[in-house]
């Protein structure tokens, strides 16, 4: 395998679709989300885990209850294998799961929510975060499997881990959905460097995290 082209081909890195459980656990690890203690807060613990199991079901993984004795189709069903995790409904619910995590959504318990503002402040240097484009490139290193040689220039992205078109999509979701300012990137820099419009900053980061995750 390691001598074969498929074993060393960069295009194959990050190519397997994660199970809903992989997606959930990986996201919680990245953001250091902790469940309430099952010994000191059992009610909250079981409420939270019950909600997470419900989310897994919505994303296509009936936890410990596969449809047949062979297990989950994604692990054995030729020829689709891991693609079995994706259907129109399952994909929509994956998007919705992330949206609930990063937004102020009452359906997601407080201990399980992600605070995008705190994450950027704690993980990204101030000067990097103040520039919308360098912020996106830096976040890609956390969120995406391939983040080398990233550029927003469509004429210079041949060796990039992501296309410039994809990065520009993230930029549009970040600052132009909706566009609040004539110069969105300059306005982002002002808002990040100064304690003004914190709610706008939060909403824009929520949009960015939702698009990238």
Predicted regions and their residues:
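Flexible, low-complexity segments enriched for small/polar residues
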Residues: 1-213
